[in-house]
Amino acid sequence: MSIDKIGAFTEILAQDSGNAFARYGLAIEYTQRGETALAMEQFDTLQQLHPDYTAGYQMAAQALMASGNTQQAEERLRAGIECARRTGNQHALAEMTGMLEELANPDA
């Protein structure tokens, strides 16, 4: 039996539109299905409602990188780095700093 994760997350959000975990999960599901525009809508909403949800910035940047939107990915990483610094999330800070360096030096 296959679980319709998009349906499940959508149902949760219909009951609680501010549920950060469900919003993030829905964005990830859309990303995994290659539906970048829908994923970015969810990541954007997540970041508007929960600006300190650091993982959202990193995963949004990864989705943008995978779809070839490197400039937007860079912008999302810079916002995520600021968020990681603000929240003291050193692991996310290191990960996103590394991703940003890879974008700046793709041949390195």
What does each model-found stretch correspond to?
Residues 15, 48-49, 83-87:
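Structural marker of alpha-solenoid helical repeat scaffolds
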Residues 11-12, 45-46, 80:
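Canonical positions in the second alpha-helix
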